[in-house]
């Protein structure tokens, strides 16, 4: 996989229709993926609460307020860390800026490939929007600017079924990891990059992030797709 995998991440906002002045607020990160030929956005479920799914807004590209459209949404049942996933099925068809080409492919082979990086010190990276750098909502120009940050990381350990810890390699540049919730975890190999999971929580003080692995994500998307097909 090429470095396009890094550009699969997007900032996540919610829209406040009753607010006359401030229409959007940032909630974290999301990332775009391709599963069996359909497009999805993956989020950390806790970033959605207490808002309604129809309030969620994900920009097609940084710098604009053109948002992805979606129809179905899904979340697993349960309160464990492995259930902290929220998925949207995207219905946007116009491929402006080739966002289709930046989607992270979620395949059964990716699970096996990523798992080989799940050893102490295994090479990982996180792509998301921690809220530093250039971040602005310009209501007069109707633009949203957020800066994506990619941080290198190393695998630490497994904490639960499909849930793991990684340690970000950063020297206190990022003071809060909350914005990375919903960001894409990537396994780095000499041959290229492989989707490895989704960030759920993190602590900048310890430089640790907790993430759900790509196998758990694959199972969630498989469940979601089956329910949509049966609808």
Language-model segments: which ranges?
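Catalytic histidine site
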Residues: 2-72, 86, 91, 152-158, ...
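A mid-sequence, solvent-exposed acidic-amphipathic segment
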Residues: 129-178, 182
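Catalytic nucleophile loop of clan PA
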Residues: 173-199
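A structural micro-motif recognizing beta-strand termini
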Residues: 89-95, 109, 166-176
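A basic- and aromatic-enriched beta-loop-alpha substructure that forms the phosphate/nucleotide-
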Residues: 68-104
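Juxtadomain coupling helices with adjacent low-complexity linkers
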Residues: 215-231
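Short glycine/Trp-rich loop-beta-loop segment that forms part of the substrate-binding cleft
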Residues: 105-144
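Extended, non-catalytic subsegments within catalytic or DNA/protein-binding/adaptor domains
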Residues: 49-61, 82, 95-101, 137-151
